[in-house]
Amino acid sequence: KYICIRPEIKNFIETSFDIDPTKTTVIYNSFDETRFKHYPLPKKKRVLFVGTIDYLRKLTIEDLIKTTKEENKELWIVGKKRADYLDNLLEPHVKYFEPTWNVEKYIKECDETAGILLGRTTIEGWLSNRPGWIYDVDETGNILGKTFNKVPDDVEKFHSKNAINNILKSYEDIL
């Protein structure tokens, strides 16, 4: 059985490789719900983007800089610089931070997250009761779409204990 970390990957595997849907399942990456939990919202409107600063995220970051400026919000960007374009894009409402494992420090200080596809920052934000912007991008970073996503009612499906139980169930089904 093929374990996929999000529905889009499941669909991609089934359609690109002609895999029978009964041979695939979605088990989301697990998240430590003791680290990512409901925190009070900050007073200042702030969007958090966490990700590698590279060609794939350039147009997304440019869009976030423009959108947050228009909406009078701060934009915090956390990530490893693998391209030098960010230095030319920073504006007074944008702050850059080096990568860190302690991302919850930044999530606590934002009221929304943003990222490409359904990634860690969006899910960690949801677990912390923050809605998130999800950018759909192609393999070159072109923006195909952008959606604002409220915290899902079934956010507990991302808890580590549920991921473990789903993995065990998949093994039991195979055996």
Give each language-model segment a name:
Residues K80-A83, V94-I107, L118-R120:
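Conserved active-site histidine-acidic residue motif and adjacent donor-binding/catalytic loop
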Residues K1-K23:
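A short, active-site helix/loop in glycosyltransferases that binds the activated sugar's phosphate group
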Residues E8, I27-S30:
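Carbohydrate-associated surface elements
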Residues R120-K157:
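Catalytic binding pocket for nucleotide-activated donors in carbohydrate/polymer assembly enzymes
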Residues T34-L48, E70, D173:
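Nucleotide-sugar donor-binding and catalytic loop/hinge architecture
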Residues R46-N88:
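Conserved catalytic-core segment of nucleotide-activated headgroup transferases in glycan assembly
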Residues K146-L175:
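A charged, aromatic-enriched C-terminal amphipathic alpha-helix characteristic of glycosyltransferases
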Residues K108-R120, R130-P131:
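Acidic donor-binding loop of glycosyltransferase active sites
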